[in-house]
Amino acid sequence: MDAPEEPQPPVVYTMENKPIVTCAGDQNLFTSIYPTLSQQLPREPMEWRRSYGRAPKMIHLESNFVQFKEELLPKEGNKALLTFPFLHIYWTECCDTEVYKATVKDDLTKWQNVLKAHSSVDWLIVVVENDAKKKNKTNILPRTSIVDKIRNDFCNKQSDRCVVLSDPLKDSSRTQESWNAFLTKLRTLLLMSFTKNLGKFEDDMRTLREKRTEPGWSFCEYFMVQEELAFVFEMLQQFEDALVQYDELDALFSQYVVNFGAGDGANWLTFFCQPVKSWNGLVLRKPIDMEKRELIQKQEATLLDLRSYLFSRQCTLLLFLQRPWEVAQRALELLHSCVQELKLLEVSVPPGALDCWVFLSCLEVLQRIEGCCDRAQIDSNIAHMVGLWSYAMEKLKSLGYLCGLVSEKGPNSEDLNRTVDLLAGLGAERPETANTAQSPYKKLQEALSSVEAFEKHYLDLSHATIEMYTSIGRIRSAKLVGKDLAEFYMRKRSPQKAEMYLQGALKNYLAEGWALPVTHTRKQLAECQKHLGQMENYLQTSSLLASDHHLTEEERKYFCQEILSFASQQEDNPGHKVVLPMQFARLKDLHFDPPNAVVHAGGVLTVEITVCSQMPIPVHVDQIAVNVHFSIEKNNYRKTAEWLTKHKTSNGIITFPAEASLFPASQNSLPALELSEMLERSPSDNSLNTTGIICRNVHMLLRRQESGSSLEPPSGLALEDGAHVLRCSSVTLQPGANKIAFKTQAKEPGTYTLRQLRASVGPVWFVLAHIHPIVQYDVYSQEPQLHVEPLADSLLAGIPQKVKFTVTTGHYTVKNGDSLQLSNVEAMLILCQAENRAVVYSNSREECSTALLRIQSSDKVTSIGLPTAPAYHVIEFELEVLSLPSAPASGGDTSVPGTPELHRKQKDSQRAGHCMVTTDHKVSIDCPWSIYSTVIALTFSVPFRTEHSLLSAGTRKYVQVCVQNLSELDFELSDSNLEDKGHATDLRLAPLNTQSQQLIHSKQSVFFVWELTWTQEPPPPLHCQFSVGFSPASEEQLTVSLKPYTYEFQVENFFTLYSVRAEILPASGAEYCKTGSLCSLEVSITRLADLLDVDKDEALVESEDYFSTKLMYEVVDNSSNWAVCGKSCGVIAMPLAAQATHRVHMEVMPLFAGYLPLPDVRLFKYLPHHSAHASQLDADSWIENDSLSVDKHLDDQLDCSSLRSRGSTHSTSSSEHKGLPMPRLQALPAGQVFNSSTGMQVLVIPSQDDHVLEVSVT
Amino acid sequence: MAVCIAVIAKENYPLYIRSTPTESELKFHYMVHTSLDVVDEKISAMGKALVDQRELYLGLLYPTEDYKVYGYVTNSKVKFVMVVDSSNTALRDNEIRSMFRKLHNSYTDVMCNPFYNPGDRIQSRAFDTMVTSMMIQVC
């Protein structure tokens, strides 16, 4: 068995490759079955279980059936997998034992021997049965026997290696079944063979890979081996697995390069470091680039060749896998890494060669992807492609610069030589793209051929890239490309095209606050504008650049000089103004003098501004002016005063916020959140419905940010015209802070708002359009005014008080002889003191002068001479006034002191508590500047409040007067006197007060007592007046004598009629009262006088020879010390005779131990319900009285009466109670009852077992 | 290590940017600014997933021939961008991640400073030192 010496020619690697299965035996039989077989085999997938834990896969098997030849079997050491026969099948339809023995068996044996010699164990014997044949031969053995024989002869222990296929060409269910069994077997065996053979191959491959550290190891050899595996996977349609093989090779190679960079070089790698001679880009249009593969096989490939080939294979597989975007992504990575690897390996590359390679490759990848995707797919995946576009554009640009295609003059000879060299490296165009008009090769060749062609291609690429970036929202990238394009245009001397791109990019950078790019772009823009002759824009940009700290000093000076030289050139052209926004200088702060920025008409106002110049050199400015807007506002002064406290610092300095140009304006101008709480209540019951926080300036915060249009101030600035301008001429602005002062004389009253700040240098006007925050000053004109106000909080009546007069002159000038005429009021005196001085203050509260006041008083008028004072000054002086106590009321109405008005107030104030009684005095003043009188009301408070009371001791009577000081001052009281106004001869008042002079401190009271004696009984009513002299305790000497304080009152019915005496006695036999035990309460009521006038009322009962009156007594214990057992009240008929006594006995129980005060015994007059009119009155009085007590008494009444009805015979009274007219109670006047047991106490000792005492009183 | 490190505010203006060597500062500014395109793209693409997984690292934003630009975004949408020399093959994803984490920690420290106004440029010396330690020392 001689194997052919020559290695087998490489198979054509196309996708038509299928695993090879050889067929031996009956060729005719196979030929007849083949169509069905090749159709049926791939129909159903088969699960392929993999070694090394790889996931099982469903696989559709196909095979390439070839006739068995011994040459097909691989020789020892041959690693080729593609040509490897995975399965050998022997076909036979022998059904005759004789025939079998004669020919088939020998043939089989021979076949088996060949296989064994090549140690191939993947074989199968197929016995095809044909019913037709069987019928022909009658003496045939049972069909099984042939199969059995074969199994016996060849398949020892492997009986499954022989299968029967019955009637393969018929269409019966048995045929179908048999086919299925056969196909399953065939697939299983094929997969087994794959697993086994590929496993073996992989093992070998791994072994080879492990040898990579050995000196003789070659990457290229290994590459071919692993690629073989990749091919097989590809053949089996397992593209994923195939890709993995290439990725592994890729990673292995990359790692070697990295290691080489780290100094760990492999020998074989040096071969890849040979200089790059060809840069014809990737080839992706063929599934396999055989040229490159051969180079690798021959170990002649360069790094670029290897990379190109590897990528072309990966690309092919990825496209099979429907992952074109990964191709794009990987391509970019590949191109970048190739450039890096060449650098790392220090491979010599002619300048531009790599650019060519990258450019071609980019376009090749893009075209390849576009070739296999439709438009919509591409459009939605621009993000993946745009990187390649922009890379290609970049490379073309650098090629253009390299070959002199961008310069104005076109390429020189050196450039041309370089171009020729570069084109030579491209080699000839590949045949597969030769017919394509837009092939990368043609594009590059054309672009390098002429300046015009380059421009066209470059612009095409740039515009395409910008468009793509824009379409996927990568605005920043688009702007950057645009800026490159602008640079290109600038080199091509077409600034008008460049400007648009520069402005666009600048706007973007400004909006996002990127200072360095802003400066750089602005610099380019300045150049562009200069070329375009846009003088205003150029000057504006220059002024920005001159104040830009990111530039060098020289550059800034240059731009500053540009402005200045422009200004000096234009001087001979008067009238022409160039208006620019003021950006070179910043308004830092502003200072007013006077500080409150309020000046009266005719006054002088100074405004001092601090301007920070950002220019690198001093700039001489012809004029600096502030345009002022004037508006007449009537309420200017008050508004300004309020505004001042809010917005201005007290020193009159307004600081302008620093505009940090670093941050985007959108960031800066956003106002702070103005949050406030919000409560929403339900309208019906005012309960809280919702609560929350609301932002008051949402409209400011959430408004759409204008896309940077306002960032660069529009150049169309207008100079505001106005009559009011503050000017300062010929100022040199030094770099840094400069102070400039403006002085103005205020003219018309109104509000002046500072609007525009402008500085002119020749015809160039720099304008700060708006001064923000708003700065205003106010000019006012004021009417003269007079203010009169008390010096203290309130004026006190009766003593001298100081009142302050303030004359604000306003526009009026006080001349010599001007005076205030005060009309005198009777009850108020103006005290003229010798040493009254007036002080004149200036507008800013500085004291100007003092002068003595000239006061002249006549009967009706007091005239105060004013000192002379200029306009807008203030005259201040003080006067003492004295409010006389109001004249005592005369006549019979003596019970009411003072005027009715006063009385009312007194009543009110008494109700309100400790308020002082007040009196108003109105003073009318004539001022020299007005024909009208000014009326001023002064309110005086009476410092005292007085109360009187009647005190009794048995039948003796005393009058007590309490004087309470309500003011803050201490007073000295003197000469207290109580005088009987009625002049009753039989009444006498004996003072019990010892001191004639007494101090009464603030908020304290002093009591005065008189004993009242009389000679005739009963005494008449007392009508008296209390008077006491008073003066402030602190004042030493008063120039005027003060009137005493008076108080009138009346005392009636003070004669004692009844004496009540209560006594508590312990229970009989006991020594002391005990808690919980009943004690007796003895009440005795004694009449002290006979019938008097006062007794003549409804209660008086006249019976036969004596008079009696009805009284009701009531025992009340408010402090709950006692429990009254039984009824606590009763009605008694009191005889109206001296020393008539009524005794009442009651039972009470002490609830506590100790000295207990006796319960109160109260006495009332019990008025019956005699007449209808009386009952009506009664009803009122019932109501007027405390209704609660009425009810109580009523209950008591019932109680009492029912009790009485038992004891006595007053049965009629009970029925009468039910009627509407009811008896009523009348309190006896305070002086008529004397309770002699008031203040008495009785000792109660605790009972022995009174730990817990429960008393229920019903 | 890194050749440029930038901290960019939510509004896309730089809070901090430092690069080395200083001559190519402008180039890095442009590069970082342009990379914001991809940052924006990635943030909007991740959307909710980003919040859920708390994955702040955005990975490689885009490679250029000479540099690799990596991104990282905090929960408050402050972006960190780091530019690494392509030739520096020793830097793997994990190292970049840990550098970003370090940067984030340091940034948090800056924010914790009561005297620092959020939104202002970062001028912290500690932050500066940390950034310096992450950048190539040009000798």
From Swiss-Prot, chain A:
Phosphoserine: residues carrying this PTM: S707
Record keyword Cytoplasm present: no
Regions of compositional bias (Low complexity) in chain numbering: 1201-1214
CC annotations in GO: cytoplasm; TRAPPII protein complex
Domain of life: Eukaryota
Effect of gene knockout: Gene-null mice have smaller total brain area compared to wild-type animals, with specific reductions in the size of the corpus callosum, regions of the hippocampus, anterior commissure, and internal capsule. Only white matter structures are affected in mutant mice. There is a loss of myelination in these regions, but oligodendrocyte numbers are normal.
InterPro entries in the cross-refs: Ig_TRAPPC10 (IPR056917), TRAPP_II_complex_TRAPPC10_C (IPR022233), TRAPPC10/Trs130 (IPR045126), TRAPPC10/Trs130_N (IPR056913)
Pfam families: Ig_TRAPPC10, TRAPPC10, TRAPPC10_1st
Compositional bias (Basic and acidic residues): 901-911
Subcellular location: Golgi apparatus, cis-Golgi network
Keyword Lipoprotein: no
Keywords: ER-Golgi transport, Golgi apparatus, Phosphoprotein, Transport
GO biological process: endoplasmic reticulum to Golgi vesicle-mediated transport; intra-Golgi vesicle-mediated transport; vesicle coating; vesicle tethering
Signal sequence extent: none
Subunit structure as annotated in this protein's UniProt entry: Specific component of the multisubunit TRAPP II complex, which includes at least TRAPPC1, TRAPPC2, TRAPPC3, TRAPPC4, TRAPPC5, TRAPPC6A/B, TRAPPC9, TRAPPC10 and TRAPPC14. TRAPPC9, TRAPPC10 and TRAPPC14 are specific subunits of the TRAPP II complex. Interacts with TRAPPC14.
Function: Specific subunit of the TRAPP (transport protein particle) II complex, a highly conserved vesicle tethering complex that functions in late Golgi trafficking as a membrane tether.
Family classification: Belongs to the TRAPPC10 family.
Record-linked PANTHER family: EPILEPSY HOLOPROSENCEPHALY CANDIDATE 1/TMEM1, TRAFFICKING PROTEIN PARTICLE COMPLEX SUBUNIT 10
Name of the protein this chain belongs to: Trafficking protein particle complex subunit 10
Provenance organism: Mus musculus
From Swiss-Prot, chain B:
Gene this chain is encoded by: Trappc2l
Subcellular location: Cytoplasm, Perinuclear region; Endoplasmic reticulum; Golgi apparatus
Organism: Mus musculus (Mouse)
Record's subunit section: Component of the multisubunit TRAPP (transport protein particle) complex, which includes at least TRAPPC2, TRAPPC2L, TRAPPC3, TRAPPC3L, TRAPPC4, TRAPPC5, TRAPPC8, TRAPPC9, TRAPPC10, TRAPPC11 and TRAPPC12. Interacts with the heterodimer TRAPPC3-TRAPPC6A.
One record GO biological process: COPII vesicle coating
Protein's name according to its UniProt entry: Trafficking protein particle complex subunit 2-like protein
Principal location: cytoplasm
Biological role: May play a role in vesicular transport from endoplasmic reticulum to Golgi.
Keyword terms, alphabetized: Cytoplasm, Endoplasmic reticulum, ER-Golgi transport, Golgi apparatus, Transport
GO cellular component, as recorded: cytoplasm; cytosol; endoplasmic reticulum; perinuclear region of cytoplasm; TRAPPII protein complex; TRAPPIII protein complex
InterPro entries (alphabetical): Longin-like_dom_sf, Sedlin, TRAPPC2L
Family: Belongs to the TRAPP small subunits family. Sedlin subfamily.
Source species, domain of life: Eukaryota
